[in-house]
């Protein structure tokens, strides 16, 4: 009798293991290698699915951090358009919400003809290039967003088989700081800032941008530390003079 129960228990455990492996394979092959970004969805409001069984605690933490990053970027894009209405007029959509939607609510792979298909730090650099005459808010946000998403492996939904590099997350936080410095200091041929963000001289202090960027940096640094601990790989700290700083690899 004991032997029968032992065999039944062994068979049951094997079935559970096979089911778990099937779920992992389903997730792995359904995800493929696509870089396509999906519309935003709050991970705390998702309904239970079979795929949820293949998530660990760290995966849920990653889901939440990515969602927070994209939420902050949406808010930042709206504020920059309000502060720089001339840039909105250069957009094919003379509407803030439509511009935000095409970046964060549509399926795409960050390849926008309007930006000569540039993304990441290349799109950020375009924002501060006199030769570029397009919508600088769009180039800045697409560049920043695609750079940050690349630090998460271009995923918004994580499972046990997914790998995220703490060093890359750390690098992305430093790149945000470099982008912020350029936003506040780089000027065009006429001596004007390429994009206005915080208050100008003789204006009342306006620090909402600093708070948003601070939250973005803190988010990336926090998850970088978490992944450093999980992966047991030390992050190499990098210090640069902002005036001569170069963007770090992602």
Question: Where is each model-derived feature located?
Answer:
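C-terminal motif of bacterial Sec signal peptides marking the signal peptidase cleavage site
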Residues: 29-32
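N-terminal amphipathic/basic-hydrophobic helices that include classical n-h-c signal peptides
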Residues: 1-13
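Bacterial N-terminal signal peptides that target proteins for export
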Residues: 11-21
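Mature extracellular/secreted ectodomains of secretory-pathway proteins
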Residues: 90-220, 238-239
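N-terminal Sec/ER secretory leader and immediately downstream segment
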Residues: 34-136
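Short, low-complexity, Pro/Ser/Thr/Gly-rich segments in the mature regions of secreted, periplasmic
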Residues: 234-250
